[in-house]
């Protein structure tokens, strides 16, 4: 194919967008970027009753968060109705489409008779004009649907980039309804006109659309358009092995942001959820674009693995800039009752984040761990009784004296701890646990020397001395 590459993401704004949906944006985006082509966003909003601006906003927000920038759009199908009607009129004029007056009740009865006879239920062409055929008299007051005059013979063939060569006999296809009685065009028709007008060269979409493809190819051929390359992606399954969907508990794309995931981790994970580049598990957005091709798209359903995504997110958190993580942590801290004023009273948030991030799988976990630096500790009485015993109090007093005299560095604090342990013949947990409780209010912290340095000498000394008083 010598045409400049043009791909598209064409969601229907009828609900929230989950990872399985957004993967159908990621791959065409990556292919367009790889081929120096154009990525088009088209909003297929012809289902007026179910479409909503809220769903459109969710699509745009999710794409923006993941960095899936589009070159053209968003293009709304509802704003192209005049164009669809123009093409419908041309098809009627050329005999490519015809009015059909068969009612829904008549069609249901026909299909029931066909099922009883062991035949495939389908429209039988009652109103299809043929040479020498006498059509029924149109019923008074009935508005017809418009049907596409599908070829009666031959085969629809395409080389799917995922499924390989696909052949469908035209005998399997009936004459598709392309416009409702009120003149509103049907999805399969609008898609063809859009892809043709927009010069789409590659359609990368879920394989739930594969049954539409032969019908769309036939309409496209009838209109004189050039069929694109199709790549039908296998389904994304949830952790229970069911198709990923809202009904089966799928999270929206933005719910991952709100849970503390980084967009680069989600993009990396999604890229591997149906495509591979050798054994590479971790790669940048730039590497993904450089490596992406249609030949290595998976042919089997991909199963979502939350633990794998969490592992990737932990990796990207460790690699992330502390200042960036600090800004991302602020909304989570605010939700935990730690506002900017509280943060200003404690150690620099960048430094706190730098300490906490090596143990975290999400930004939310970083924020939860960081709260100890911005709250007055309130250790539980049982924990105090267990760890701050009469036997350890002399060691705590000596540690305070050593910390008052030490340089306030991680190395000096570590040396003071070790000297106190040796002098009192204690093991690290016997001293570190009560110190953590008294200073931080919890026994679960990163390395004790690093934590104490961040709290600052005055806070550490005053809190331990208050417990010994």
Curated annotation (Swiss-Prot):
InterPro entries: aa-tRNA-synth_I_cd-bd, aa-tRNA-synth_I_codon-bd_sub2, aa-tRNA-synth_I_CS, aa_tRNA-synth_I_cd-bd_sf, Glu-tRNA-ligase_bac/mito, Glu-tRNA-synth_I_codon-bd_sub1, Glu/Gln-tRNA-synth, Glu/Gln-tRNA-synth_Ib_cat-dom. Keywords: Aminoacyl-tRNA synthetase, ATP-binding, Cytoplasm, Ligase, Nucleotide-binding, Protein biosynthesis. PROSITE patterns: AA_TRNA_LIGASE_I. GO terms for cellular component: cytosol. This is Glutamate--tRNA ligase. Belongs to the class-I aminoacyl-tRNA synthetase family. Glutamate--tRNA ligase type 1 subfamily. Transmembrane segments: none annotated. Its EC number is 6.1.1.17.
